[in-house]
């Protein structure tokens, strides 16, 4: 009888010390970033010995993409994932992975990540945030409702922008930028608010972009932008050292898995676009040279 009481007391103490983190995710549950985050959350929860539970909230259900960074920083959400280059105003380094044609392969993207990571982590720490991991999207391509054969075809094209780099690209190519979050892409194309964008084959597939009159995907391999997962430092400091170490280990595994998933999506999602009836291919050499010159101008 005394043993039963003792076990109950120990269990109640453990439960009292247990932490619950709500993880804000901007993208739908079927997106590989969200699926990877869900697996990370599950693994952390299982390996914490009851000390930490992470509950994921995909599809902007807890906070929308543009709200997640601030929500985690202020502690409204303990953990969240955010598209890094949308945060250029917070720290210009967060936008380095969206510098056009600076990194046009996964190898170069990893080199760029390794070169910038330490300073990014330091900058986030100063803002009360702990960096866990980052995963790239597949190579960014150009989507369009109409065929693009020359620089003139870009003039006045209503273009979806999501950070300062894409706004600048629009300005340098004569396109008309409109700021649209990923969750609003389908609506923006269906209403005619935009008619072109630069984003990954994954985003196009997940939003079924072909249902909104988008017929062309041009694989220009413009850049490999990343999502990062961050934790509120106050929430982090409530964990004991062993739990923190375990979370970091799982974060490293999630990062490795995420890069693999991204590489798979780079091939498979372009095939999905083609299977849905879209024209998938490259732009002509003169147009590719024009885009690369834009990248040099922005460097």
Report residues per predicted region.
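Short, basic/polar N-terminal leader/transit segment immediately after the initiator methionine
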Residues: 1-3, 20-21
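Bacterial N-terminal signal peptides
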Residues: 3-12
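N-terminal secretory/targeting leader peptides
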Residues: 18-110, 116-299
């Amino acid at each position: 009888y005394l043993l039963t009481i003792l076990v109950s007391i120990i269990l109640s103490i453990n439960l009292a010390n247990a932490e619950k983190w709500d993880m804000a995710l901007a993208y739908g549950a079927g997106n590989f970033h969200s699926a990877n985050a869900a697996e990370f959350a599950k693994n952390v929860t299982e390996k914490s010995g009851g000390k930490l539970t992470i509950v994921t909230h995909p599809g902007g259900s807890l906070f929308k993409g543009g709200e997640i960074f601030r929500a985690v920083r202020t502690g409204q959400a303990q953990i969240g994932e955010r598209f890094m280059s949308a945060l250029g105003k917070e720290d210009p380094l967060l936008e380095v992975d969206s510098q056009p044609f600076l990194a046009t392969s996964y190898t170069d993207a990893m080199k760029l990540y390794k070169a910038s990571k330490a300073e990014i982590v330091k900058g986030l720490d100063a803002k009360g945030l702990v960096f866990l991991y980052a995963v790239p999207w597949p190579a960014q391509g150009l989507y369009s409702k109409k065929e693009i054969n020359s620089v003139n075809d870009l003039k006045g094209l209503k273009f979806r922008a999501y950070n300062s780099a894409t706004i600048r690209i629009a300005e340098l190519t004569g396109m008309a930028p409109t700021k649209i979050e990923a969750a609003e892409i389908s609506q923006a194309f269906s209403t005619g608010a935009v008619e072109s964008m630069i984003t990954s084959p994954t985003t196009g597939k997940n939003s079924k972009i072909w249902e909104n009159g988008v017929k062309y995907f041009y694989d220009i391999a413009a850049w490999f932008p990343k999502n990062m997962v961050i934790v509120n430092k106050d929430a982090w400091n409530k964990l004991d050292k062993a739990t923190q170490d375990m979370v970091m280990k799982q974060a490293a595994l999630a990062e490795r898995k995420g890069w693999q998933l991204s590489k798979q999506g780079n091939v498979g999602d372009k095939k999905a676009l083609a299977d849905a009836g879209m024209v998938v291919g490259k732009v002509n050499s003169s147009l590719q040279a024009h885009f690369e010159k834009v990248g040099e101008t922005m460097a």
